[in-house]
Amino acid sequence: MKVLVIQPKIGMGDMIIYLPYIHAISKRYQTPVSILVKKNSRANQLLADDGHVDEIIILDRSKNDTGIHDGFSGVFKISKELKKRHFNKVFIYNGSLRYLLISKLAGIKSISQYPLFRKKDNIVTSAKIFTENELNTIVSTQPILHLNKEKVDNLRNNFTQNFKHVCLGISASGPTKRWDIKNFIKLCESINEKIPSKFYLAAGNND
């Protein structure tokens, strides 16, 4: 059984939100699954050591429609790529007709998808209800990042123990998700007053 999960939302945060459902699908079918995601989901980094994920396929779409999978021709390009992999089952975490068409053109016989054309929804609630209905089991919303223990131990040994090391994920995929920089500064000052700390900023050049 070859299973594909299509998760087209952008950003690391959204990718992590969907992890419990990807893991649940993998456990249900007792096989690692492949995922179709956008590059800025950072799935290649987040899931590098995740045994529930077999292959990470990048969906190249952009806001200005310049990605190789954008437009009508992009539908055929990505469906051709997927068809080569001979998937038996797909879970589509999106209500777009586009991804239904892609799955059908890819020759995937069993398709589970959000209700077509649904746009406004709660990302966590919708994913949870959809997955639980499809798998007929309760799924926790708590995400788990599977990390290589040796890598973690080696990294930990390189840090001084004289103070706490705090990583701040200040990046966001949209303006409604951003927290003002003044809030981060106030938070760091408050933490540092209680516990001497060193802060690391996880963000891009434009954040």
Feature names for model-found ranges:
Residues 1-207:
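Catalytic machinery of carbohydrate-active enzymes
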